[in-house]
Amino acid sequence: MGPMSSSTEDRRFEVLRAIVADYVATKEPIGSKTLVERHNLGVSSATVRNDMAVLEAEGYITQPHTSSGRIPTDKGYRQFVDRISEVKPLSAAERRAILQFLESGVDLDDVLRRGVRLLAQLTRQVAVVQYPTVSASTVRHIEVVALNPARLLLVVITDTGRVDQRIVELGAVVDDDDLSALRALLGAAMDGKRLAAASAAVAELPESAPQQLRDVLIRVSTVLVETLVEHPEERLVLGGTANLTRNAADFGLPGSLRQVLEALEEQVVVLKLLAAAQQPGTVTVRIGEETQVEEMRSASVVTTGYGVSGSVLGGMGVLGPTRMDYPGTIASVATVARYIGEVLAER
């Protein structure tokens, strides 16, 4: 806000905060009379009217053409979010329920699906979680099983709980000794390494391998490198899209909601929104045009990263109309992300 005495500035911010709170709660444009009645602003309605005129001139609030009241602009929401000092914490009972629900997930996929369902319920918006990015995970174990003497099953297990199985046709028969040697070589090259490093190590194996294993290793390493470097981080879990249609009017112009829903279908768009916020413990709020996605101009996105012991596995967050309960949404996103991290760390 412009240069003015801090007490005037603070009071004006209180007026803006009151307008945001009332508009989010009621969907009704707010007039100065209502503000004075509902909020203990400690000044006359003439002062509030004057403050509102300044807020409007500075672009923080605007007058919808059919009403005498005012509603926040994206700039107004931004100012509000930047100055949120207290985020509404979830109650102890809510936090306990969230943790229990996540802990009963049977595996990584289930925990993430549960996280999305929870976020959508808590915020009454669309929730989205990105599967752990491959680059962040490590190989926990590689298992080699002979299905028959010329056919192997390779099983790669990562620390994020992902299991990949691939069958390799060898074109020749391997005996038990060769199989043991193959297991040892692959284990030494891959176990405990980040996927990119494991893939590089496997690609080099055929050159240094004993002669009788070379052909087998060329086939095995080709399949493994493909497995390790493919990109399942393109996978997203979405929940609560019905919440958007319930709030269709909040998306402003007719057709805006359809644009938002179409943008959500584009995984690349959503991944870009999530990728920008990968600090665990910090929540990023992008309002309207700040999303830098043309179709999302009428929406806000609240995102964070989730992960285990300081390393980020993926992004998650909530998408809804710019008229959203920011303090509540920020708290929900932060809490669910934190607990997903805790649950995954215990696995």
Curated annotation (Swiss-Prot):
Which keywords describe this protein according to UniProt? Repressor, Stress response, Transcription, Transcription regulation
* One Gene Ontology biological process: negative regulation of DNA-templated transcription
Q: Which residues form a coiled coil?
A: none
Q: Whose protein is this, by species?
A: Nocardia farcinica (strain IFM 10152)
What family is this? Belongs to the HrcA family.
What protein name applies here?
Heat-inducible transcription repressor HrcA
Query: What's this protein's function?
Result: Negative regulator of class I heat shock genes (grpE-dnaK-dnaJ and groELS operons). Prevents heat-shock induction of these operons.
- What Gene Ontology terms describe what this protein does at the molecular function level? DNA binding
Which Pfam families does the protein's record reference?
A: HrcA
Lineage, please? Bacteria, Bacillati, Actinomycetota, Actinomycetes, Mycobacteriales
